[in-house]
UniProtKB/Swiss-Prot annotation:
It holds the Pfam family tRNA-synt_2e. It comes from Nitrosospira multiformis (strain ATCC 25196 / NCIMB 11849 / C 71). This is Glycine--tRNA ligase alpha subunit. The gene is glyQ. HAMAP family: Gly_tRNA_synth_alpha. It is found in: Cytoplasm. PANTHER family: GLYCINE--TRNA LIGASE, CHLOROPLASTIC_MITOCHONDRIAL 2, GLYCYL-TRNA SYNTHETASE.
Length: 301
């Protein structure tokens, strides 16, 4: 039986062998692994990119005080990002399942069409959910747009739900019963955090502070974009997005206001995406093959 940390190590070794740079989690609250700069920003422009990383993910509304066996406000995703998306990306994914110990002939693996969209980040793509014996464990996406900008070449993203994969591999029905490593369970590591963070998310966050924080992060992001600093600006966008999610968890935002807030974050994300693209362009897209860069600049002329 693979422990939770052994599953992570196996995926890291597998994607490293496929030529991916093994990166570390982004050190801020994000609602999905896609929000890591290694995906959101690196999907822009002509520069090739191959990376893999674990990303802790926070979704305040999904907290259940540690009482739900498979729903958490904090959990883990594993991301593999391949740009341009290789023609054999599905085969590479199936190879990763074999690496984890799945017998592809003995398990029901289905690719269910499910195009992906993140309205907050102005991103969308064509894709599939991967169902393993009736449970969704992975999302495939071919990015079409990020920050409202067309992606060329197309980036392929594979997002694994680590807890779900581990629950199947370990044969448990409760996420807290997962073996993290010998002598240590997922409950030992994270149950108290789920309980306390749920109380914070749903009852003890300071609404006045959060509304003020959102406005401050929004203003700071705009200022940083104007100063030509897209990376710090993007961090402010992520802070604004997490603050919005906390307000949403408290029910402090009406349906009408919710759409308006999402629109404000999306506009920030778009401005950051454009600023980042221009910053790489000024550098001459240093990671791109010369012929790609020349073709792009000629079309823009």
């Amino acid at each position: 039986m693979r422990t939770f940390q052994e599953i992570i190590l196996a995926l890291q070794h597998y994607w490293t062998r496929q030529g991916c740079a093994l990166l570390q989690p982004y050190d801020m609250e994000v609602g999905a692994g896609t929000s890591h700069t290694a995906t959101f920003l690196r999907a822009l422009g002509p520069e090739p990119w191959k990376a893999a990383y674990v990303q802790p993910t926070r979704r305040p509304k999904d907290g259940r005080y540690g009482e739900n066996p498979n729903r958490l406000q904090h959990y883990y995703q594993f991301q593999a990002v391949l740009k341009p998306a290789p023609s054999d990306i599905l085969e590479l994914y199936l190879g990763s399942l074999e690496e984890l110990g799945f017998d592809l002939r003995q398990n029901d693996i289905r690719f269910v069409e499910d195009d992906w969209e993140n309205p907050t980040l102005g991103a969308w793509g064509l894709g599939w959910e991967v169902w393993l014996n009736g449970m969704e464990v992975t999302q495939f996406t071919y990015f079409q747009q990020v920050g409202g900008m067309n992606c060329k070449p197309i980036t392929g993203e594979i997002t694994y739900g680590l807890e779900r994969l581990a629950m199947y591999l370990q044969g448990v029905d409760n996420v807290f019963d997962l073996t993290w490593t010998k002598g240590l369970s997922y409950r030992d590591v994270y149950h108290q955090n789920e309980v306390e963070q749920s109380f914070y998310n749903f009852g003890h966050s300071d609404l006045d502070f959060l509304f003020q924080a959102f406005a401050s992060h929004e203003a700071q992001a705009r200022h940083l974009v104007e100063q030509g600093l897209p990376l710090p600006a993007y961090e402010q966008v992520l802070k604004a997005a997490h603050t919005f999610n906390l307000l949403d968890a408290r029910g402090a935002i009406s349906v009408t206001e919710r759409a308006a807030y999402i629109g404000r974050i999306r506009e920030l994300a778009r401005s950051v995406a454009h600023a980042y693209y221009e910053s790489r362009k000024r550098l001459g897209f240093p990671l791109a093959p010369v012929e790609w860069t020349q073709e792009l600049l000629e079309k823009a002329a």
